[in-house]
């Protein structure tokens, strides 16, 4: 275990091995996220009066057990994902930074609280501590939580329209600013273009509480049906009984409950076949149809000044 200081303000950082962070010496570091099993270490910095989020691979944190070079390669692949997927809900990507001993992605800083803040809250505290972001989320009105879910599902449908599968998407990918009622998707590093296959078996990326049967199965294809399952699991976490999938714990309508139960079917061919179909049914059931799926997708593309190909 190595304790070092980084940034011009000498912010403390603990590593498994020593590493040179001189490239941060001219900026102020105001927070560090160093408990990621992906091998990344992330920083909140202030440079020229502006806040940025840096995601860095190249140093060994205390949680990562793999090879540092593999973490670097994964983050380099993630660069392409952030370049190709741009959405109003997604944390705003700026540019890559190649270091002598590592690789970094830079983003605009987004204020918000993570729905799976495991570095500050134990699993018990996550569900019971008054200041836990997840507890605060569950205290919002059902209408507010349905609105959050609708935004998440719209983002997922857009990602699908670009030919991507959302690998390792879970509540830790979700930030919420309670003061501004603003949702941010913060982590899409492992999203992949179709086709995607499980090459590692039960250790496939993903949070156990949301993982799908095929995410434990070696050589299984990871598809839109997989993503539908994960999205329904998030719905049960936000407005249901979490692991208890009974209707008694569900806080919304029977129609939405039945829809999410269908999405959680263990057999892929009995789920919704696409995120688009799941999302459109969701919109229909909550009475928020303000345009077809294609119109919503096109509006995002127009705002970006791009097409969806």
Indicate residue ranges for each PLM-predicted region.
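Juxta-kinase regulatory segment immediately upstream of eukaryotic protein kinase catalytic domains
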Residues: 1-31
């Amino acid at each position: 275990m190595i304790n070092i200081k980084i940034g011009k303000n000498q912010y403390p950082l603990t590593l498994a091995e020593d590493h040179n962070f001189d490239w941060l010496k001219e900026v102020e570091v105001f927070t560090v996220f160093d408990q990621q099993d992906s091998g990344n270490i992330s920083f909140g910095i202030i440079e020229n009066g502006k806040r940025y989020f840096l995601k860095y691979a190249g140093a060994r944190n205390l949680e990562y057990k793999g090879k540092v070079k593999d973490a670097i390669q994964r983050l380099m692949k993630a660069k392409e994902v952030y370049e190709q997927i741009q959405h109003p809900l997604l944390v705003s990507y700026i540019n890559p930074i190649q270091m002598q001993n590592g690789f970094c992605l830079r983003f605009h800083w987004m204020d918000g609280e993570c729905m799976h803040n495991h570095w500050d809250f134990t699993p018990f505290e996550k569900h019971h501590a008054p200041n836990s972001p997840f507890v605060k989320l569950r205290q919002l009105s059902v209408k507010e939580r349905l609105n959050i879910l609708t935004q998440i599902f719209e983002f997922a449908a857009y990602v699908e329209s670009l030919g991507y599968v959302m690998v390792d998407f879970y509540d830790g990918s979700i930030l919420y600013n309670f003061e501004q009622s603003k949702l941010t998707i913060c982590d899409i590093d492992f999203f992949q273009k179709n086709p995607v296959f499980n090459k590692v078996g039960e250790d496939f990326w993903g949070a156990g509480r949301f993982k799908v049967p095929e995410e434990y199965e070696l050589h299984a294809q990871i598809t839109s049906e997989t993503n539908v399952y994960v999205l329904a699991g998030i719905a049960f976490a936000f407005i249901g009984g979490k692991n208890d999938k009974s209707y008694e714990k569900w806080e919304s309508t029977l129609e939405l409950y039945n829809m999410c139960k269908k999405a959680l079917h263990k057999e892929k061919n009995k789920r919704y076949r696409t995120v688009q179909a799941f999302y459109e049914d969701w919109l229909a059931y909550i009475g928020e149809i303000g345009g077809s799926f294609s119109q919503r997708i096109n509006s995002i593309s127009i705002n970006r000044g791009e097409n969806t190909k």
